Amino acid sequence: MKKWLLAAGLGLAMVTSAQAADKIAIVNMGNLFQQVAQKTGVSNTLENEFKGRAAELQKMETDLQSKMQRLQSMKAGSDRTKLEKDVMSQRQTFAQKAQAFEKDRARRSNEERNKLVTRIQTAVKKVANDQSIDLVVDANTVAYNSSDVKDITADVLKQVK
């Protein structure tokens, strides 16, 4: 009787694990993120958003470099002292604006990245629910997967569109 119960329990465990394996899928999040970012034009949006400020910084840098070259060729005098103060002030202003620019650009980039991640996660959940999948794992974190594991990357990409 004990052997029969043990065999029945083992058989039930194998059936349960086989059913669980059918409900696992993988998705390539890196690939999805890259493709969705290209399709939505996030990089172009960010580039256009910061184009004016980047041009202003480039102009300031060019102007500062020309003043520094003039300063190097000048001899000591009141004009040189005035130009030195102007260059120091402009260098400080440039550094502050450049730092603010980088900070704003990084913040906006993170905002857009988070929006994309949210869209992708929502699509993954929808595809998983539609296909009765219990567990979805990022393909990049899996050391090995058999050919039995379903890859839903293409389905998720269609859903995100």
Swiss-Prot record:
Q: Where is this region: Lipopolysaccharide binding?
A: 97-108
Q: Which biological process terms from the Gene Ontology are attached to this UniProt entry?
A: chaperone-mediated protein folding; protein stabilization
Q: Which Gene3D superfamilies match?
A: Skp domain
Identify the SUPFAM superfamilies for this entry: OmpH-like (SSF111384)
* UniProt superkingdom: Bacteria
* Cellular localisation: Periplasm
Give the matching InterPro entries. Chaperone_Skp, Skp_dom_sf
Keywords associated with the record: Chaperone, Periplasm, Signal
Q: Which GO terms describe its cellular component?
A: periplasmic space
User: A Gene Ontology MF term for this entry?
Assistant: unfolded protein binding
Q: What is the residue range of the signal peptide feature? A: 1-20
Q: What does this protein do?
A: Molecular chaperone that interacts specifically with outer membrane proteins, thus maintaining the solubility of early folding intermediates during passage through the periplasm.
Q: Which family does it belong to?
A: Belongs to the Skp family.
Quaternary structure, per UniProt, is: Homotrimer.
The protein's name is Chaperone protein Skp
Species per Swiss-Prot/TrEMBL record: Salmonella typhimurium (strain LT2 / SGSC1412 / ATCC 700720)
